[in-house]
Amino acid sequence: MKLARVLLDGRAYEARVEGEELVTTWGQRIPMEAAVLLPPTEPSKVICVGFNYRDHAQELQVEIPQEPLFFLKPPSALVAHGQPVVYPPHTRQLDYEGELAVVIGRRCRDVRPEEAREVILGYSIFNDVTARDVQKVEKQWVRAKAFDGSAPYGPWVETELDPSDVRITTRVNGEVRQDSRTRFMIFDVFTLVAEASRYMTLEPGDVIATGTPPGVGPVRPGDVVEITVEGIGTLSNPVTGEQPADTRRGR
């Protein structure tokens, strides 16, 4: 089942996807092309994982991690399917990173990998938008990865998916930039859920973005980024705003 959130008359409502329609909990049917989708859950936190594909770590010339490298994005970074990613003024290289997202279904702490499936609601799609030039010079990734608009998430949550070997494809203006499968992850989905739950309580709706495969690269205003995950669908976001000719550093 695909679970979504939709904006109707200025309010958010839950819905399920049936073919090319959204069906609300009271039975109203909304054509997909007319729907205004919201991020499919309201996470208390977004947990991201760095360098979880060996060949991605190699393309960025970093060491292969021996344990998951976690970092956080705030809920204010979220962007819904179809909504714009506004080019931030503090970077000159804004990169896409297509990822599979795990969505937590119930409150949990200290989950074992073999129990992780029981606390997962389902899976979605995530774009870990990154100010790459900032990331390269700063040890903390707040300005590089936690700014407003850095977390496109959606379009819905698929509750019936085997995440062990699904295809992830990222296109920019229709051109394939990333094409890989989740079987190439260093740490699988259930290990990531278990490890994250060792350090923080996971709440319903929380998101764990599981890392990006190789092929990351920059986007410019006017580009459209489409990330497709087999069995889920496609997350699409245009890039708007202006790419700065200069940035101020040292603040």
Describe these PLM feature segments.
Residues 48, 80, 95-97, 203, ...:
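Residue-level recognition of short, solvent-exposed, well-ordered loop/turn junctions
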Residues 1-68, 161-163, 169-171, 175, ...:
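N-terminal non-catalytic cap/leader segment that marks the start of a structured domain
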Residues 73, 98-100, 104-106, 124-129, ...:
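Short, structured patches in soluble enzyme cores that scaffold and shape functional sites
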Residues 39, 56, 64, 87, ...:
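Catalytic-pocket segment enriched in acidic/His residues
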Residues 109-123:
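N-terminal accessory regions of nucleic-acid-interacting proteins
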Residues 30-35, 64-65, 79-91:
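Short acidic (Asp/Glu) patches
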Residues 64-81, 96, 226-230:
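Structural signature of FAD isoalloxazine-binding scaffolds in flavoprotein oxidoreductases
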